[in-house]
Amino acid sequence: MKRVLNLGNLSRIVEGDPNEITDDEILVIKDKIIEGKIIDIQKRVDGKLVSLITEKYTYTINPTPADAIVVINGSTTKSIRAAKGHTVTWSVSKTGFVTQSGSDVISGDVSKDVTLVANPAS
């Protein structure tokens, strides 16, 4: 559910579910701990939400085997966009292989190769 915070001539400023944001709206993301603090403002460009105030970087995991399951910050995905200083937690798993996991702090674009090894118990 989204809530309109302000109605302008060219766009609406809203907060809520990012999936509901249209091309003519600006999404305001508030801090969940500090009341009233805005941590990001985003707008949809070419179908994707991009930050207007914080620089974002791409964090990608390239798993071997290629069909391994990659989970980044709790979501099954091989790539995310995150702000500098953000901690990313990840895991790569596949039946018959030893799961690998870890965390990294974003400081720029990352393309991380993760190779799983066969589980000797399988």
Swiss-Prot record:
Forms short fibers at the surface of the viral capsid. GO terms for biological process: symbiont entry into host cell; virion attachment to host cell. It is found in: Virion. GO terms for cellular component: virion component. Its main location: virion. Keywords: Host-virus interaction, Viral attachment to host cell, Virion, Virus entry into host cell. This is Head fiber dimeric protein. Homodimer. Interacts with the major capsid protein. The keyword Ribosomal protein does not apply.
